[in-house]
């Protein structure tokens, strides 16, 4: 029974104490080495400094040495990707007006122009235009070996923007696990899979068959970019490493995004989102002050989302680079570095001071109040902040004249000193009120406030509905499905969407016929031989 994931979930209260007892026998380093040696995702819960000093991070050069006029010699995070073995050089924070571009007078018009901005404008307007009105990326083709969330989220962004994303899978042991998320044995009915794979084409090929790799090579020859978020050694084993791809198409843009990158002593580590969050120091910081056992963290897989967004940006940049430079690129995007990039100030603080920053919960050093307050009902909350005197005065007037005149809260410094007392007063006020009523009243007074919404709240949110972000569709396989729309809107470019489920292998023959150029006879023979499975 314990081999069944659903059974383990149902009996977590029994399993977790046993795991804690076992793990407690080892140091962090010992248990990491033991479990990683067996292919089990396990990493230490690092502090920011622990992450910055990790041998893997140092060997990859993520923490770059810089010299700043104010701080002197220190380190700060580099960009979280490596292009053709090189990182983009890090520039320190500019001093005020230190990067003001020299101006010049245009000989054509006599106008005074900014030299750098003019050059950037010229660069930005060069390059091919979209081939039709189906989105700004119409005409771009991506072959994607993605699965679960990080890769699919990035390629969904590309697909929403008009790119032709062809998702590679196989019914012979290579299906995206999200196809079965909460649905049992049917690979074609998971709403979670639909959310992160809509607008894509599903292509199946059996790479265990001798003809499978040549078929993929013919498809890749028609692509602009290839990406994957597999473990670091997978693509080499199946004959799809960058050197092999370049033989198929010399100017291919190839992005790889394993958990800890493609180089470094820990590149072979098995990871999932929660491991990466812990490895980078984010889990350590995600806590209330003084609480260290255990860190609270979050079940939201932030590494997947932030890596997915960066993946989309870098793919677009890589294709633009190829069009201008007439050569491809190999891009190593480490999900761990993409995540650590989110806490850059904490990493810089640790590097500059030699002291680890500590968790501060919901507090802010620049705003009081700044917290999450309980409201009427079961687990209902409202977040309230006051960043300046105007907002504080408006909030204090709502709380009552006694609060507005209380000397403990007169200035921001006073409120910082008496933060706990103020939070208690606000909590007493919010507890008897509906969270949405609290938000509405404070917003009308100009005080930043927002309800901690549930999934159901979001699907009924009037603002999201008014903007067309909440979409209800009737899917032939799933029935009525509520999905989030794409968060960007373009005034002069239409985004054409396909909301039907990307059925496993549905588009294989059409892609081979219309993209690769295979004849019907060839496709029929490949199907008969078991290649297209």
Positions of PLM-derived features:
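A short glycine-threonine-serine/GTX helix/turn-capping micro-motif
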Residues: 3-6, 295-306, 328, 360-361, ...
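Conserved Rossmann-fold dehydrogenase catalytic segment
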Residues: 262, 292-301, 323-339, 360-365, ...
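Aromatic-enriched alpha-helical interface/lid elements that frame and gate functional surfaces
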Residues: 1-38, 369-445, 449
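Terminal low-complexity tails and localization/encapsulation signals of metabolic enzymes
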Residues: 10, 14, 18, 33, ...
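N-terminal helix-loop segment corresponding to the beta1-alpha1 unit
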Residues: 6, 29, 66, 98-324, ...
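Redox-cofactor-proximal catalytic regions of oxidoreductases
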Residues: 73-96, 186-218, 276-285, 371, ...
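Mid-domain beta-loop-alpha active-site segment that forms a flexible
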Residues: 301-316, 335-343, 387, 391
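Oxidoreductase and adenylate-handling cofactor-binding alpha/beta cores
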Residues: 308-329, 341, 345-353, 396-403
